[in-house]
């Protein structure tokens, strides 16, 4: 460079795109060389007429493409030189900064610095640190380190400082420093503290740290800046060229900074990368017009620009070269059988093959670049993202794949093996392809899944088809029996849980025996499905159901369940038209044809029962699901319920089912049913099936996660078949309850989750129940089935509509249910009697184990006894005994089969054991039902009437019915008990779903965001469903309500029965107190009347659905109160219960996580007291009635 020319001092300190950053530059001022480095302050005049100002050099860089030497500086003016002028607020040492930094070419900046600044008199005259002071103690090194770390932002300025020292700049007279106001204040403070000390103390590290400034210059001037202003004329200065400002932020700014870069980034792949900015800008259009992506060769562009060829000619030449290169490259690569199909992206822009090739050749080719590790330079030339950490590798691999073969070809090195990295390159490509295929495959899978779901909804799988056909038969039969659209809602609800199960279980089933078209086959399929579902866990079912809920695909899985449910449905139909209808009507509603297929299959049902016993787990689950659907309201009822309980998604699903059931097969409705159940609640915290599954699995343990949405059966879930048999036994008695509970459960998504967990189990139980009762159902008139499903639908409708009009029609069914319910309730009544509670608990526990073992073995016997019980409704006690006997036998079978399941938590309160509990309860109920059932029957009849009057018109299952008059109620309980057990099992499984239906019952529930606020009927239904299995005591209420239900059958049968039972229980027992505690756990009316007063209608606990489920779900004994607590007067009085509810509602039991509640209070209590599972529900049922 010439003596006066500018030159960089020191090594570059940064590289970014086309910019090379430096720390200092040297120029000649008044004939003497001077070095300005980053952070230096110096006087400048922007124009000869402008006032003197201070410039802070902040950035120095060279733009490689245009060879521009640029600087960025911040200017400081005295207050009087600003438009506003100086005022009293300005300090004597204050300067004001220009808000915008100025970009100035170095030559112009040097011109600005050439001026006379002797007139500057402002600033604090600081005492310079004498250089001699630095000689001692290495203070100079310390000061240099301080300046490097603090003043120079950590950049290594040693070389610059050395240059400055060589020039003697340390002694520069004109040295100005502008501090921030805080720095200035600290500096002044330090000066004051060391005013009597030598200036060398400022070099002390502590003095420096405390704000001291060691100034080396002879005449330092300290100023501070705390404000900025907009300079009016600075923009007009010709020297200021902001257009050259470096683009350093965000994505490749280089493109913006450098016209070439911009062109290349703009995707025109300018050929002008190396051309001067002007040339580049002019050539942009051409480059962009160029079809080829590659940028022009930098070298060629530079040469042309340097040669000052016409800009257009330069651009054209670059473009021509680029075109020729691209043509040759593409041709060669195509001939080489490695055509270039897609140009990859580097950073944020597509690779310009021409630019990449030119840059590589410029640096010596592939071998040289790789040896020197200069691929990052190529990446920079391509304008890649500066922040990329894999730029070099990616660039090299792209080059190896796209250009290296051609480069070798040009150099005659074709035979030279390509770098070993190329395979990696290919691998990357293959990986990309694989990723693409994976992505597309995932999409396909998702789409296929969706299609499968839709197909399931619309066209069941082979197994599903058989199931659908059976379901269609079922539906046809149910429709024939019911001749009402009620089944539609219930099937929807049912279908939803089933949909989940079917989705999860159906696939397995289809694999297992997709071709099985017989109901028996379907039962086995359902069993397999249930087992697979259990193995797979509820998660798959739950996840898939969410999709089906709105779709009919979920219903199709439901259809698979429906066939399973249909056997039990048929059994239920035999036992009670209502249960049958409940299970069947879903299929009817959903498929309409499935039932007819079932009717066709009915004859095989007996043989199917055996097959189903094996298949029961799935069948029970499907049955439970179907049961949910079976608790169908007439389409009118459903609509009414939907209207009444907008909160209940299940109701919505019922509406959907109404449409779909009428329009489509039950399979379609299943998904819908399930999802509405899962999402039915207006709960703000609706959980996804997976989340619910996780929550449930946490609550109930691994078994819960396996396939019981309810959670209490989790252990049984893993052994679904055993559970299914067990559930069949308990499901027979609980079947009616569970079906009713299914209705209510439908209205609660949270309940549904539990129900789904238990639903498999419930389906299994149902299946076994259906197997047991298949003959009854088969033998029973279609009217019975219709009546039952209608009755359950009515219960649903009643629970939502609180209708009493159809109770007469329901009475018979209710009686049947009441009988079945009464069996369990008497047992529960014993629980509730303080003397009986412990003995009953022990008996129940004993029966549970015995019955579990005997359940499966005795399933046929149970079916026979169940059939006998249903057939001999006139002899409720006999039925009860038979049912219990069969229950015990089946329980034993189940226990044998479920030994493993029993190994799992045997909490009677747990859903899995609820079946066992039911049987145990039934056994206890048998023993205690004689006196207590009569007692409970009368009590519950009265209570059920009252509760009916309140909200639940007919009290089917009041946990407290145990003490009711035993004979008639017992007959109801016994004849209905198998049904009740089924209902209970059904409700256990549907416990989650059931609360929803209950909530649908009452407007309060509808308004309530949390299931806890389920109407008393809802709770009653839930309790009836869930508790009924454990406590048939409501059977008398059922009986009483059964009559009303007969009339309410289509409108309020289920609701009434449940409500009645709950009411009876509340009145007849101390249990009512529990109701206030967990509104979701207790009958809706209680919660509505008692809790609603305490809990906002919209109150929704995060665990609300779980709580609701607990009401229905054995998994969570909502208030698993100790039997002692139950016996005590704690829950005796409604007022006490209300208070207790307040406290409990306020307390953690409800507030705490469902798992906590379960594990802390429910499981221990459940484990200790099988009653606990029932007491809370019963209590809730009782108390709501009392409140009512």
From Swiss-Prot:
GO terms for molecular function: transcription cis-regulatory region binding; transcription coactivator activity. Residues 265-275, 594-609 have a biased composition (Polar residues). PROSITE patterns: ARID. Induction: During smooth muscle cell differentiation in vitro. Upon adipogenesis. Residues 445-459, 470-484, 493-504, 526-535, 1036-1048 have a biased composition (Basic and acidic residues). The modification N6,N6-dimethyllysine is found at residue 337. Methylation at Lys-337 prevents DNA-binding. Demethylation by PHF2 promotes recruitment of the PHF2-ARID5B complex to promoters. CDD domains: ARID_ARID5B (cd16885). Keywords: Activator, DNA-binding, Isopeptide bond, Methylation, Nucleus, Phosphoprotein, Transcription, Transcription regulation, Ubl conjugation. SMART domains: ARID, BRIGHT. Pfam families: ARID (PF01388). The modification Phosphoserine is found at residues 264, 1032, 1133. InterPro entries: ARID/SWI1_ChromRemod, ARID5B_ARID/BRIGHT_DNA-bd, ARID_dom, ARID_dom_sf. It comes from the Eukaryota. Belongs to the ARID5B family. The ARID domain mediates the interaction with DNA. Transcription coactivator that binds to the 5'-AATA[CT]-3' core sequence and plays a key role in adipogenesis and liver development. Acts by forming a complex with phosphorylated PHF2, which mediates demethylation at Lys-337, leading to target the PHF2-ARID5B complex to target promoters, where PHF2 mediates demethylation of dimethylated 'Lys-9' of histone H3 (H3K9me2), followed by transcription activation of target genes. The PHF2-ARID5B complex acts as a coactivator of HNF4A in liver. This is AT-rich interactive domain-containing protein 5B. It comes from Mus musculus.
């Amino acid at each position: 460079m010439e003596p006066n020319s500018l030159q960089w001092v020191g090594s570059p300190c940064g590289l970014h795109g086309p910019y090379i950053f430096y720390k200092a530059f040297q120029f000649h001022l008044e004939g003497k060389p001077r070095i300005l480095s980053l952070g230096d302050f110096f006087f400048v005049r922007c124009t000869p007429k402008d006032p003197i100002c201070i410039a802070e050099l902040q950035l120095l860089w060279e733009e490689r493409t245009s060879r521009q030497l640029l600087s960025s500086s911040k200017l400081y003016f005295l207050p009087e030189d600003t438009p506003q002028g100086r005022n009293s607020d300005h300090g004597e040492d204050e300067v004001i900064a220009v808000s915008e930094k100025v970009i100035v070419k170095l030559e112009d900046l040097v011109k600005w610095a050439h001026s006379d600044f002797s007139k500057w008199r402002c600033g604090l005259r600081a005492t310079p640190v004498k250089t001699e002071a630095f000689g001692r103690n290495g203070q100079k090194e310390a000061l240099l380190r301080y300046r490097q770390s603090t003043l120079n932002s950590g950049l290594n300025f040693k070389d610059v400082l050395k240059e400055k020292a060589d020039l003697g700049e340390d002694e520069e007279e004109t040295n100005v420093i502008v501090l921030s106001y805080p720095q200035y204040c600290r500096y002044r403070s330090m000066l004051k503290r060391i005013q009597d000390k030598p200036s060398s103390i400022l070099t002390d590290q502590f003095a420096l740290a405390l704000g001291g400034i060691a100034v080396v210059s002879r005449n330092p001037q300290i100023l501070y800046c705390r404000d900025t202003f907009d300079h009016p004329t600075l923009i007009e200065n010709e020297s200021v060229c902001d257009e050259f400002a470096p683009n350093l932020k965000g994505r490749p700014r280089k493109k913006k900074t450098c016209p070439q870069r911009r062109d290349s980034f703009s995707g025109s792949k300018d050929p002008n990368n190396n051309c001067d900015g002007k040339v580049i800008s002019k050539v942009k259009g051409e480059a962009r017009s160029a079809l080829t992506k590659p940028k022009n060769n930098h070298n060629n562009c530079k040469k042309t620009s340097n040669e000052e060829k016409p800009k257009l000619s330069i651009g054209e030449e670059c473009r021509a070269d680029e075109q020729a290169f691209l043509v040759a490259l593409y041709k060669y690569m195509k001939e080489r059988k490695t055509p270039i199909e897609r140009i990859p992206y580097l950073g944020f822009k597509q690779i310009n093959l021409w630019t990449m090739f030119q840059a590589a050749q410029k640096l010596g080719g592939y071998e040289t670049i790789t040896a020197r590790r200069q691929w990052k330079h190529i990446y920079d030339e391509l304008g890649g993202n500066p922040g990329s950490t894999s730029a070099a590798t990616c660039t090299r691999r792209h080059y190896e794949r796209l250009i290296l073969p051609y480069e070798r070809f040009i150099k005659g090195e074709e035979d030279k093996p390509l770098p070993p990295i190329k395979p990696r390159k290919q691998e990357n490509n293959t990986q990309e392809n694989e990723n693409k295929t994976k992505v597309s495959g995932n999409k396909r899978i998702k789409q296929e899944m969706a299609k499968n779901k839709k197909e399931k909804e619309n066209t069941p799988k082979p197994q599903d088809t058989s199931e659908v056909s059976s379901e269609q038969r079922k539906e046809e039969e149910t429709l024939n029996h019911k001749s009402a659209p009620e089944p539609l809602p219930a099937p929807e609800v049912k279908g939803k849980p089933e949909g989940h199960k079917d989705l999860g279980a159906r696939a397995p089933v289809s694999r297992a025996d997709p071709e099985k078209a017989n109901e028996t086959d379907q039962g086995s399929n359902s069993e397999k499905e249930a087992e697979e579902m259990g193995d797979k866990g509820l998660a798959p079912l739950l996840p898939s159901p969410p999709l089906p809920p709105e779709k009919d695909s979920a219903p199709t899985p439901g259809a698979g369940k429906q066939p399973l449910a249909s056997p039990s449905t048929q059994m239920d139909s035999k036992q009670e038209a209502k249960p049958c209808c409940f299970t069947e009507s879903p299929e009817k509603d959903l498929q309409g044809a499935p039932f007819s297929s079932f009717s066709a299959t009915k004859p095989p049902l007996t043989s199917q029962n055996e097959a189903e016993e094996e298949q029961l787990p799935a069948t029970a689950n499907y049955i439970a699901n179907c049961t949910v659907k079976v608790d169908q309201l007439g389409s009118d009822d459903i609509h009414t319920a939907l209207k009444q309980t907008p909160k209940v998604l299940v109701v919505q699903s019922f509406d959907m089912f109404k449409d779909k059931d009428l329009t489509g097969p039950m399979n379609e409705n299943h998904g819908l049913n399930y999802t509405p159940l899962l999402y039915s609640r207006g709960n703000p915290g609706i959980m996804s099936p997976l989340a619910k599954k996780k929550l449930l699995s946490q609550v109930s343990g691994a078994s819960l996660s396996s396939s019981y949405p309810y959670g209490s059966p989790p252990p049984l879930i893993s052994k679904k078949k055993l559970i299914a048999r067990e559930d069949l036994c308990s499901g027979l008695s609980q079947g009616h309850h569970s079906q009713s509970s299914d209705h209510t459960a439908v209205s609660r998504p949270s309940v549904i989750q539990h129900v789904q967990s238990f639903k498999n189990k419930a389906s299994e139980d149902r299946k076994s129940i259906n197997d047991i009762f298949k003959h009854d159902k088969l033998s029973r008139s279609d009217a019975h089935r219709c009546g039952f499903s209608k009755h359950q639908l009515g219960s649903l409708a009643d629970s939502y509509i609180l209708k009493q009009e159809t109770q007469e029609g329901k009475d018979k069914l209710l009686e049947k249910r009441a009988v079945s319910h009464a069996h369990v309730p008497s047992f529960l009544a014993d629980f509730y009697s303080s003397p009986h509670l412990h003995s009953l608990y022990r008996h129940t526990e004993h029966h549970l184990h015995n019955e579990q073992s005997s359940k499966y073995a005795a399933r046929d016997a149970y079916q026979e006894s169940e059939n006998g019980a249903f057939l001999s409704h006139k002899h409720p006690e006999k039925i009860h005994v038979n049912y219990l006997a069969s229950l015990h036998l089946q329980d034993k079978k189940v226990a044998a089969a479920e030994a493993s399941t029993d190994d799992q938590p045997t909490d009677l309160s747990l859903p899995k054991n609820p079946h066992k509990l039911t049987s145990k309860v039934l056994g206890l109920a048998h023993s205690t039902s004689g006196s207590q059932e009569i007692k409970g029957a009368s009590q519950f009849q009265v209570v059920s009437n009252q509760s009916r009057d309140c909200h639940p018109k007919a009290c089917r299952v009041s946990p407290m019915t145990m003490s009711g008059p035993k004979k008639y109620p017992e007959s109801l309980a016994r004849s209905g008990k198998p049904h009740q057990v089924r209902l209970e099992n059904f409700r256990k499984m549907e416990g989650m779903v059931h609360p929803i239906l209950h909530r649908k019952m009452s407007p309060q529930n509808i308004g309530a965001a949390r299931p806890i606020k389920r109407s008393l009927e809802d709770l009653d239904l839930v309790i009836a469903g869930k508790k009924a299995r454990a406590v048939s005591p409501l059977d008398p209420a059922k009986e009483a309500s059964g009559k009303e239900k007969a009339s309410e059958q289509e409108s309020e049968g289920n609701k009434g029965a449940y409500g009645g039972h709950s009411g009876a229980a509340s009145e007849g027992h101390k249990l009512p107190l529990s109701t206030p505690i967990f509104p979701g756990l207790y009958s809706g009316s209680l919660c509505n009347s008692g809790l609603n007063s305490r809990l906002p209608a919209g109150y929704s606990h995060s665990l609300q659905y779980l709580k609701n489920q607990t009401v229905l779900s054995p998994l969570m004994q909502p208030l698993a109160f100790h039997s002692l607590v139950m016996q005590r007067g704690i829950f005796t009085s409604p007022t006490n219960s209300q208070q207790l509810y307040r406290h409990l509602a306020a307390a953690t039991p409800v507030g705490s996580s469902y798992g906590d509640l379960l594990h802390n209070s429910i499981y221990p209590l459940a484990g200790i007291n099988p009653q606990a599972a029932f007491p809370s529900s019963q209590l809730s049922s009782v108390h709501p009635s009392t409140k009512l």
